[in-house]
Amino acid sequence: MKQETTSTNQITEGVIWKQLLLFFFPIVMGTFFQQLYNTADTVIVGRFVGKEALASVGGSTAQIVNLIVGFFVGLASGATVIISQFYGAQDKRNVDRSLHTAFAFSIVGSVFITILGIAIAPWLLKIMNTPENLLTDSVLYMRIYFAGILFVFIYNVGSSILRAVGDSKRPLYYLIVCCILNIVLDLILILVFHMGVAGAAIATVVSQAVSAILVTRALMKSDDLLHLELKEIRFYKAALLSLIWIGLPTGIQSTMYNASNMFIQASLNTFGTDTMAAWTAFGKIDALYWMVNSAFGIAVTTFVGQNYGAGKYDRMKKCVRIGISMALIASLIFTIIFFLGGRSLFHLFTDDTAVIDIGMQMLHLIAPSYFLFVFIELLSGALRGTGDVIIPMIMTCGGICLLRVLWIIFIVPLKPGLETIIFSYPVTWFITAVLFIIYYIWKSRKL
C-alpha cells in the first residue's frame, strides 16, 4: 500500500546540479571523517610507535579487513538500492520490511564474520607473505578489530539506508563525533598507556560502537516512511531475496576487487618493510581522492534509484551526466594537488626518506589515471540504482580483478619490479572504463 506525503522530494523534483551538490557535500565530508577516523590509527602509530607498527596496522591487515568487510557491505547494499526505489515510490510497507531485514542481516552476518576473522587471521596473513617481524602485531590488530565487527556492519548499513532516503547530514554528524573520539582514544591508549597496535585497534572498535549506536537511534526516532523497531528486526523473505539478488553481485565484485588488491599486496610484501610502509601511507593519501569519487558514486546511485522508482528516466540520465562532469573535475584537481604536495603528505606518516621516495613513485604512477575510475564508479552506481548488478559485476571482476591477477602472473615476471606491479592499476582501469561506457550507453537507450 502506498502512502502519500505532503513534502516535495527534492531528489526527484529539485534542480539537479544543486540537489546533487547539497546531497554530495555531507557524504564527502562524512567520507573524509571516515578516512580521518581510519587514518588516525596509521598516523599516530607511524609517528609514535614506528614503521613496523605502521606496516602492521596497514598493508596486509588493511587488505584482509577490506576484503571481508567489503563483501558484507556490498551484499547489504542491496537493501540500500531497494529502499531507495521503494522510498521514491512512497511504498512504506516495503521500505519497512527492507529496513528490518537489513538489520537482521547485519547482526547474523557479523556473528559469522567475527568467528571466521578471529580464527583465520594468522593463516591469511601468512599466505600474503607478511614478514615474520610484523606477524604478531598484525594478528593482534585483526583479532581486536573483528571482535567489534558488529558495530562496523550496523553503522555502514544504517548510514547507507539514511543516505538512500536523502539524509546525508546525520551520518556526517555521527562520524565527526566518533572521529574525534577515535583520535582522543588513540592518543590516550598509545601515548599514555603505551598499548601500541592493540591501543589503536581498541580505539577504533570503541569509536565504531558509538557510531553504530547513534545511527540506530536515528532510525528508531524517525517518523518518516523509514522507522526502525528493534522488536521487528527479522528476515522478511521477499526483502531478503531482493537484498541478496541485488547485493550479492556487488558483494562478489567488492570481494574480487579486494582479492586482487591482496594479490598485489602479497607481491609488494616481498620488497620488504619500507615498501609495505610506503604502500600503507600511500593508501591513506590515495583515499583522499577515493572518498570524493565514492561520494559522487553514492549520490548518483541514490538519485538514480529514487528517480527510477518514480519513473523519471530522463531526469535519471541527466543526474548521471552531471555527476560524471563534477567527478572528472575533482579527479583533475586531486591529481594536481598530489603531484605538487605529495611529499608533504607522506611526511604526516613518517620521516623515513626511503619510505617517502617509494611512496612518491607509487603516487606518480597511479594519480594521473584517477579520471578513468570516475566512469567505473559512477556508471556502476547508476546501473546499480536501476537494479542492474550482474553485468557491472562481470565487467568489474573481469576487467579489474581477473586482468590484475593475470598481469601479476604473466607480465610482472617479464619485467620484475615495483613499477610493473603498480602499473596494473591504470591498465585495468582503462579497459574496465571503456566496457562500462559502452554498456551504459547501450542500456540507457533502452529506457
Give the role of each language-model region.
Residues 13, 17-36, 40, 64-71, ...:
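Residue-level signal for short hydrophobic patches within transmembrane helices
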Residues 22-41, 144, 155, 178, ...:
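Transmembrane helical elements of multi-pass membrane transporters/channels
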